[in-house]
Amino acid sequence: MCIRDRSKPEKDPRDIAAAGKAKKSGYPACALCMENEGYAGHLTHPARQNHRIIPLILDGESYYLQYSPYVYYNEHCIILNEKHIPMVINGGTFRKLLDFVRQFPHYTAGSNADLPIVGGSILSHDHFQGGGYEFPMVRAPYEKYFEIPGAENVEAGIIRWPLSTIRLRSESAGDLARAAERVLTAWRSYDDPACFIYHETEGKSHNTITPIARMREGKFELDLVLRNNITTKEYPLGYFHPHPEYHHIKKENIGLIEVMGLAVLPARLKQEMAELEDRILCGQDLRESERTKAHADWAESWIAARGINPAQGTKGTGGNGGADPGGSLLRKRLHGAVQEEIGIVFAKVLECAGVFKYTKKGREGFDRFLDSLR
């Protein structure tokens, strides 16, 4: 997994949902509107004097391409609708994404889901994200293949990935979009109580898809990630959302970028992890600091297992049998361990977001959904 700190503030999923419903009266209406180009900004809106957008036509509709001010990966770009309209996932979404990678075959392009909790941080303006970066998800192999009746020109299968993902491939963008729309239609109304999947409760829809498009070996490819945003008393931020035991690392929505395997983590972790490493090396109680107390149980669960012994480091052995008078080798080992353990937490967070778990019950549930497509 890839780890990145982020420069944007950490957001509560409930605040994101509320922002998506709020009526906008300011100018520009949101941070993605085309009116941001060259805008000087004001007290509550960032300046965008150097901002430029490039017009595109996707499936007959007007869009604009811009490069993101928050560069999470190589050539990170945003493809925004000319109009300030809400995010939506439908057949048109698939056609537009495929049209984009047809025009830019060296780029990946995807869309956040159109529902709170499983969507991104901006639900109020229709947009996609793309770029020239190979995400870990691209390398995920097929786990099994299946057939979609009437879509003989489309290769279909599920891939080995923490989130439940169907991969479709075809030389025909039209055939691929139609097959994807069939999967979306089936998923929108799908229930499986055994896997706690309900498409609707109290009049609220829960099932949607995070789609990702790319060109590979001369074929169009679509990854369809099955999402569900149901909440419970035990999990008020989302049942298929990072569970509370991981919130000290990742509490926000699992959006498009995370779905593809790149961890977008809160900026606070930089200082928190630096202090955590210092306190571990000095033998100080992690629970005595505001910055590290939330990480105490987590750190204590792996320090001994990784053979990290601060006392040995201060005595000059570094815990590895060699001279380490300043403890620099131990510090380096500890820093590497922290990075690896954050990656493990991120993988667990992705597993939380998977609707069909990697258990016997989860795999049987995935098979039942595939059967519903036949």
Walk through the language-model features, giving the residues of each:
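SsDNA-processing nucleotidyl-transfer enzymes
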Residues: 17, 23-76
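Residues forming anionic-ligand binding surfaces in small-molecule and nucleic-acid pockets
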Residues: 68-83, 158-162
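Histidine-centered divalent-metal-coordination microenvironment in nucleic-acid enzymes
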Residues: 76, 81, 118-135, 225
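Beta-rich nucleic-acid/ligand-interaction surfaces
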Residues: 116-124, 201-208
